[in-house]
Amino acid sequence: MGFLAIVLSVALLFRSTSGTPLGPRGKHSDCNSVDHGYQCFPELSHKWGLYAPYFSLQDESPFPLDVPEDCHITFVQVLARHGARSPTHSKTKAYAATIAAIQKSATAFPGKYAFLQSYNYSLDSEELTPFGRNQLRDLGAQFYERYNALTRHINPFVRATDASRVHESAEKFVEGFQTARQDDHHANPHQPSPRVDVAIPEGSAYNNTLEHSLCTAFESSTVGDDAVANFTAVFAPAIAQRLEADLPGVQLSTDDVVNLMAMCPFETVSLTDDAHTLSPFCDLFTATEWTQYNYLLSLDKYYGYGGGNPLGPVQGVGWANELMARLTRAPVHDHTCVNNTLDASPATFPLNATLYADFSHDSNLVSIFWALGLYNGTAPLSQTSVESVSQTDGYAAAWTVPFAARAYVEMMQCRAEKEPLVRVLVNDRVMPLHGCPTDKLGRCKRDAFVAGLSFAQAGGNWADCF
């Protein structure tokens, strides 16, 4: 690949009973907070799968979140998904077409469906919403405040892909970080603002650990699509039948059902800058139906990019190998998707930094989490019935890769330990580590953590890509 083509900026969150439609929603304020994420309509918004706004899982953590008093953090790597966005180009066309078809064929729009008669589809496509930008500012502030013993004097080294919503998310993270620093009277006043240090182009022409595109067999895989089709055929026909009975003249496919459900989260995160107004699409569906929708999106990511796809985890191997290099301050060893040109240079891949921040997409985060073995306890998901998070060992798309998802890899030094300890937090849930012996707080010794990443060290099954 041509090095000059790399773009660098180096100088640079109901009245509900099962089966009962949801009641009307009013406005809420203070929906989003730096510490807890999105807290409005939790019975509903926590069931939006990968379209859920980030919400803290601290209360679901099997281990305490606080750092013990005899320990101090010496290294942090945050890996984050971009903030809330509008639908992709293809989904924009599909959603608008479903709504237009209903408006053309329906002979009546009773009750809660009245808004559809004159509804004008006006969502943007692909880009961050104002709420999504605020999510990333909040993430920057959270990062600064959580690790202020370091951030008062040290800037994170920041990488992103060159996709607009990803790169802008990194920029908003920087804004939130720097604003928090400026409000901190204990911070070094002479420390310059951080910046987006590296922006890596997306596409099959570039090696990029923050975006999949190189593994040809994976890119043509239909495993995820097949799983989605299987479960859609299980839960959506009954919904289509109910909606058709409510909207005389309308005929709906199962895909139309999924499209209408998706309008609920997408419009909610687009209407206001704190997502305090719930879209009227949300009340068209029952609590049970939202549970099914949430599971559908979990299946999509599990079979598309996680352990349910034979080539899913290997898409995250490159980033896992970069993490090991950063933890040990040793050169990267990888023959998958690492950009060797960038990773060989201290300017674009320093090994002596203390704080790192990488920004990517939901799909890539799923692959990376599996490459790290974080969900090794998750058995193959059923494609015919809903499984709870207790049945999936803590995996669900809304718990794993919501809008503005964040994973923290922390290394800490403790008085009673000669070797530093490592733990991983996904959306404030301290993860059970599967590849190394853990203590009662869910931590592994650094060398054991690295040794446990044998799948990544061996390059996974990258050879099956071609």
UniProtKB/Swiss-Prot annotation:
Root EC class: hydrolase
EC number from the UniProt entry: 3.1.3.-, 3.1.3.8
Disulfide cysteine pairs (residue numbers): C31-C40, C71-C414, C215-C465, C264-C282, C436-C444
Gene3D superfamilies noted in UniProt: Phosphoglycerate mutase-like (3.40.50.1240)
Catalytic activity: 1D-myo-inositol hexakisphosphate + H2O = 1D-myo-inositol 1,2,4,5,6-pentakisphosphate + phosphate; 1D-myo-inositol 1,2,4,5,6-pentakisphosphate + H2O = 1D-myo-inositol 1,2,5,6-tetrakisphosphate + phosphate; 1D-myo-inositol 1,2,5,6-tetrakisphosphate + H2O = 1D-myo-inositol 1,2,6-trisphosphate + phosphate; 1D-myo-inositol 1,2,6-trisphosphate + H2O = 1D-myo-inositol 1,2-bisphosphate + phosphate
InterPro entries from the UniProt entry: Acid_Pase_AS, His_Pase_clade-2, His_PPase_superfam, Histidine_acid_Pase_euk
Pfam families linked: His_Phos_2 (PF00328)
Primary location group: secreted
Record: active site: H82
Hydrolase listed as a keyword: yes
Record's subcellular location: Secreted
Keywords: Disulfide bond, Glycoprotein, Hydrolase, Secreted, Signal
Signal peptide: 1-19
Residues that carry a glycan: N120, N207, N230, N339, N352, N376
Residues involved in 1D-myo-inositol hexakisphosphate binding: Y51, R81, H82, R85, T88, R165, K301, H361, D362
GO cellular component, one term: extracellular region
Keyword Secreted: yes
pH dependence: Optimum pH is 5.5. Active from 2.5 to 7.5 with phytic acid as substrate. The optimum pH is shifted to more acidic values with 4-nitrophenyl phosphate as substrate.
An annotated Gene Ontology molecular function: acid phosphatase activity
Function of the protein: Catalyzes the phosphate monoester hydrolysis of phytic acid (myo-inositol hexakisphosphate), which results in the stepwise formation of myo-inositol pentakis-, tetrakis-, tris-, bis-, and monophosphates, as well as the liberation of inorganic phosphate. Myo-inositol 2-monophosphate is the end product. Has a broad substrate specificity and is also able to dephosphorylate other classic acid phosphatase substrates such as p-nitrophenyl phosphate, phenyl phosphate, fructose 1,6-bisphosphate, glucose 6-phosphate, 3-phosphoglycerate, as well as ADP and ATP.
Family under the similarity heading: Belongs to the histidine acid phosphatase family.
Quaternary structure note: Monomer.
Protein name: Phytase A
Source organism of the structure: Aspergillus terreus
Gene name, Swiss-Prot/TrEMBL: phyA
